[in-house]
Design a protein with these regions (language model features):
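Hydrophobic alpha-helical segments
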Residues: 1-154
């Protein structure tokens, strides 16, 4: 058996999951719904996805851009990946609040301080906050699964 590195990422993960049939289809429908919901803009979710990918060191994930977030400037993305989002004036207060929350989420979702959560609520509202938490869980899970599939023997 030969070990091959497959460039799996959260977007093309469905290619590997189709064997699960209806469950895979439902999983993919949720993925698409997250990017199309009205509470957190796709561009902000893309910043979160890239930040989680950076934190996981998920190279295939970092190389990919979500089509629904095409409005994001590549220089802004590179600033995020260099960890300059806290001081770069291209990032709005809303984006900073969400990215800060994302980093706390990555470390331990249960340890997120109320102040960090309240900053997100101040910018996105309660519905946006709930949508963000659900999206982060799903995005993080898909990144992790894609990383596993990238290392599976063919």
């Amino acid at each position: 058996m030969v070990l091959t590195m497959v460039s799996m990422n959260s977007a093309n993960l469905i290619d590997r999951l189709t064997i699960a049939g209806a469950s895979a289809q439902a999983f993919d429908q949720v993925w698409r719904a997250i990017w199309n919901q009205p509470h957190v803009p796709a561009a902000i979710l893309e910043l979160c996805r890239l930040n989680l990918a950076r934190l996981h060191r998920a190279e295939a994930e970092l190389a990919m851009r979500m089509p629904l977030a095409q409005s994001l400037d590549e220089e802004k993305i590179q600033s995020l990946l260099r960890e300059n989002w806290m001081t770069d004036p291209r990032f709005s207060a809303s984006e900073r609040a969400v990215l800060n929350f994302t980093e706390w989420y990555h470390v331990d979702p249960q340890s997120i301080p109320d102040q960090v959560a309240n900053e997100v609520i101040a910018h996105l509202g309660q519905s946006g906050f709930v949508a963000l938490i659900e999206a982060l869980g799903f995005i993080d899970g898909r990144i992790r699964i894609a990383m596993i599939y990238s290392r599976i023997q063919e």
